């Protein structure tokens, strides 16, 4: 079969960056971020977080091919922000949100564990 090895879905090859940045030369304040070894799960979460930013005019992602494990996130921002700032802010906000969820979950588990 022509399918790649399973480990290739999540192991970033040596010498390959996890995230690469490509500025769009045709549109001002637009760029693409290629994220290696990720899929729709991360792409959709990052896209939705970018949509919360009022300085983001467009945010979308695509999975170029089902057997190539990378996503391309495209961002177009207003002149008040840059795509790099918007991307970094989205990642930081998601990190805080997931940390909060983790802490809340652990607190509830601890409450439940103490009951028994």
UniProtKB/Swiss-Prot annotation:
Pfam families: RNA_pol_L_2. CDD domains: RNAP_II_RPB11. It comes from the Eukaryota. Keywords: DNA-directed RNA polymerase, Nucleus, Transcription. It is found in: Nucleus. Signal peptide: none annotated. InterPro entries: RBP11, RBP11-like, RBP11-like_dimer, RNA_pol_Rpb11_13-16kDa_CS, Rpo11-like. GO terms for molecular function: DNA binding; DNA-directed RNA polymerase activity; protein dimerization activity. The keyword Thylakoid does not apply. GO terms for biological process: transcription by RNA polymerase II. PROSITE patterns: RNA_POL_L_13KD. One of its GO terms (cellular component) is RNA polymerase IV complex. DNA-dependent RNA polymerase catalyzes the transcription of DNA into RNA using the four ribonucleoside triphosphates as substrates. Component of RNA polymerase II which synthesizes mRNA precursors and many functional non-coding RNAs. Pol II is the central component of the basal RNA polymerase II transcription machinery. It is composed of mobile elements that move relative to each other. NRPB11 is part of the core element with the central large cleft. Belongs to the archaeal Rpo11/eukaryotic RPB11/RPC19 RNA polymerase subunit family. Component of the RNA polymerase II, IV and V complexes. Interacts with NRPD1, NRPB3 and NRPE3B. HAMAP family: RNApol_arch_Rpo11 (MF_00261). This is DNA-directed RNA polymerases II, IV and V subunit 11.
